[in-house]
Amino acid sequence: MMTALSVLRKRLGFAKPFLEKLFSIEARAAEWWAAGAHHRLFLAQWGIFPLPEFFEHKVGLYWRWKATGQCYFVERGVFSLLAMEPGCKVLELCCGDGFNASYFYAARAGSIESVDFDPKAIAYAKRNFCAGNVTYRVADIRTAMPEGEFDNIIWDAAIEHFTETEIADLMVNIKKRLTASGILSGHTIVEQPDGQKMLPHHEYEFKSKEDLARFFRPHFRNVKVFETIYPDRRNL
């Protein structure tokens, strides 16, 4: 027996080509407007000092990915997601706007504790990227790294904001908080070939895969660092 909904859908069949064309035009217009709006937002945020403490990943999603062909903001989320087992307990350090926790990790993790020292970043994350198994809170990991034991700790696109001494000290605390089979994952940027920083506000940019690996080897038996290369940058 046909339901009222199925009858309505059948009767509207004659209008399907028109509706598809209409909504396709609407979708393209929305895409064009969203790209332009996020491009303008990017220019305002990163073209005028002071520079922000975190990157709004909607800029990457709606504008930068298509405009530049650079998808490293996506590869970061995917690489850490691949290290997770279903139901895992996750600590995300320096979470920024919360994009990765919501778009990537929340679907697989049992619980996620995401922290950042910037109250503006945490407020943004709570407004835009909330999920039932994600908790956002303000914390400076140099002095107040969350306690507990975690299956995964993610330090994504943030290690470069710390000095070499701070990185070494933080690695000790990270290791203490991982389970016996726990995994630390993350992403960072390589300095320019002439030794100059890619971004001036970074404390330390790594020179090579080996330069990054030296911070891990005192604490982990299994260390894997790989490089992805884009026209304007190299990532680890």
Residue spans of the language-model regions?
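Short catalytic micro-motifs in class I SAM-dependent methyltransferases
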Residues: 157-158
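A conserved beta-strand element that flanks and buttresses the S-adenosyl-L-methionine
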Residues: 154
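Local beta-strand N-terminus motif with an aromatic residue
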Residues: 87, 150-151
